[in-house]
C-alpha cells in the first residue's frame, strides 16, 4: 500500500514531547484522525518502534492546531493522547505541557504573525473549552527558543513562555467538585474529586501506606498500590459523572504528602496507568487548587499561603513546579479566577510524516 505524507513539527512542550500538526492537513472525522495518529505514534508496541512515539505517555501526545473562529481566541488547540500499548486514542483530556509549544508552533506554521519582541497568543483548548493566553518570546518577529529559563524535568535552559489559564473550573464536568462533596470515600480510601483544568482524584499518600516521596520506578513496581488506585479511580469516575472510565485517561489520580524540600506540598501524579516523571501542567493547577481548599484531603499537610495571588510550589519526582493561583475562599469552596505557570518549549524537527494512504 502506498504511503502519504503529512507535514508536521516535532516539539518538546514543557516536560512532554510529540508531533504538532496543522489541522487542515488531517481529516475532520475523529475516527479517521485516530487511525492516522495510531500509525504516527506506532501504538501497540512498548517502544512504539514503528512510529515516533517514545514508549511513554508523556511522549505519545499530539497537538492539532488551526485558526480559531472564536473571537476570544487566535488559535484552536485540539489534543490527543495516544496509548503506548493499546490501539487507543483519547480525545477527552487536554495537555498543558504540550500546550507550551502551541504558541511557537502556531507562529512557525504561519497560523498567526509574530510581533517583536513578544507575541501574545490566545489559545482555545478545544477538548475542554478553556482559554489560555501564552506569551512567546519573538524578538525580531521570530520565535526565540534559546533562553535562561530552567524547568525541572528538562535539561538545560530555554526561552520563557508564560501561560495564563482562564475559565479552568469545571473544565470537564462543569463543577469544581463534581461529586458535590469536599471528600468522598471509595474502597476505604478518602479522596477529594476536583475539576480544575484536569479532573483529578486526590488522596493522601499515607492512605495507601506510601510516603509520597517514592520514585516513579518504586510506584509503578508497587502492583498492589497501582491496582488499588485504579479501583478507586474507576469508582470516583462514576461518582464524578464521567461514566465508565476504564478506557479513558481521565480522571487522573494524585497522592499528597507534606513538602520536604521547601515547597508547599509534595505530590505524585498518575496519567493514570503510569506515574508522571515530573508533573502535568493541567494537573498542577488542580493539585494546587485542592491544596489550598479548606476541608480537602490536603488539609493539614501544608500551611496555606496567605497572599493572593498565591504561589503554590508542588514538589514532584524531578523537582518542583510553581503555580500562581488567583482565588478567593468562599462558603462553597474555591472561587478560582486564573492560574499561571512558566514553561519552555523547543522545536526539535520539522518535515513529513508517512502513513498508509
Task: Spell out what each predicted region is.
Residues 1-357:
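A glycine-rich beta-to-alpha transition motif near the start of alpha/beta enzyme domains, typified by
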Amino acid at each position: 500500500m502506498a504511503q502519504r505524507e503529512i507535514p508536521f513539527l516535532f516539539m518538546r512542550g514543557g516536560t512532554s514531547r510529540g508531533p504538532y500538526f496543522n489541522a487542515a492537513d488531517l481529516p475532520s472525522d475523529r475516527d479517521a484522525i485516530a487511525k492516522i495518529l495510531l500509525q504516527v505514534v506506532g501504538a501497540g508496541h512498548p517502544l512504539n518502534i514503528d512510529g515516533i512515539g517514545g514508549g511513554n505517555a508523556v511522549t505519545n501526545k499530539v497537538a492539532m492546531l488551526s485558526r480559531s473562529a472564536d473571537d476570544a481566541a487566535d488559535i484552536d488547540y485540539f489534543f490527543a493522547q495516544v496509548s503506548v500499548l493499546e490501539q487507543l486514542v483519547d480525545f477527552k483530556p487536554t495537555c498543558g505541557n504540550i500546550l507550551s509549544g502551541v504558541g511557537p508552533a502556531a507562529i512557525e506554521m504561519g497560523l498567526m504573525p509574530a510581533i517583536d519582541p513578544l507575541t501574545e497568543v490566545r489559545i482555545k483548548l478545544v477538548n475542554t473549552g478553556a482559554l489560555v493566553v501564552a506569551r512567546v518570546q519573538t524578538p525580531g518577529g521570530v520565535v526565540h527558543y534559546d533562553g535562561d529559563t530552567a524547568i525541572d524535568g528538562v535539561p538545560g535552559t530555554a526561552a520563557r513562555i508564560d501561560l495564563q489559564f482562564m475559565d479552568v473550573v469545571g473544565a470537564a464536568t462543569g463543577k469544581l467538585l463534581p461529586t458535590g462533596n469536599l471528600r468522598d470515600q471509595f474502597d476505604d480510601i478518602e479522596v477529594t474529586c476536583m475539576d480544575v483544568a484536569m479532573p483529578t482524584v486526590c488522596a493522601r499518600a499515607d492512605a495507601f501506606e506510601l510516603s509520597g516521596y517514592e520514585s516513579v520506578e518504586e510506584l509503578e513496581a508497587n502492583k498492589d498500590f497501582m491496582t488499588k488506585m485504579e479501583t478507586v479511580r474507576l469508582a470516583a469516575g462514576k461518582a464524578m459523572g464521567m461514566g465508565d472510565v476504564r478506557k479513558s485517561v481521565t480522571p487522573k489520580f494524585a497522592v499528597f504528602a507534606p513538602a520536604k524540600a521547601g515547597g508547599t506540598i509534595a505530590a505524585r501524579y498518575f496519567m493514570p496507568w503510569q506515574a508522571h516523571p515530573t508533573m502535568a501542567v493541567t494537573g498542577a493547577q488542580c493539585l494546587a487548587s485542592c491544596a489550598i481548599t479548606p476541608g480537602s484531603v490536603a488539609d493539614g499537610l501544608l500551611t496555606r499561603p496567605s497572599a493572593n495571588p498565591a504561589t503554590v510550589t508542588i514538589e514532584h519526582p524531578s523537582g518542583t513546579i510553581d503555580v500562581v493561583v488567583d482565588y478567593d475562599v468562599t462558603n462553597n469552596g474555591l472561587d478560582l479566577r486564573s492560574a499561571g505557570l512558566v514553561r519552555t518549549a523547543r522545536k526539535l524537527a520539522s518535515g513529513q510524516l508517512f502513513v498508509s494512504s
